[in-house]
């Protein structure tokens, strides 16, 4: 199995929220929650991709897992039937990445039911990266979104 760019991008984004993640949730959702449980993110990647995770599994250090994937030019993932690890290979080199028990991870167990949105807007990854760069430069962690009055 190969991971789509969309999934890799979602996982890279979610690692900034929490290094723990559980994958293989029904419906193709990828969800993450901060360790303080004050921030939650959810991405529905299944309709865009031609596969389903074979089973639910946990990753303790998502950054490490992504770094392992990045060691290969075009990695292929083969999930073990014992549900304990995935083999990552490029046809020449391979290694096993062992899963974590989902019960010890800080992961969302259910969705938060929110009332209808008061506001909605689109923020591209380029715009978000620009905001993160500005935030790091100015040493601030606050962001304000305001309606432009013309």
Where are these regions (language model features)?
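DNA polymerase processivity clamps
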Residues: 1-98, 114-150
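Charge-dense, extended regions
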Residues: 94, 103-104
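Flexible glycine-rich active-site/ligand-binding loops centered on an Asp-His dyad
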Residues: 104-106, 115
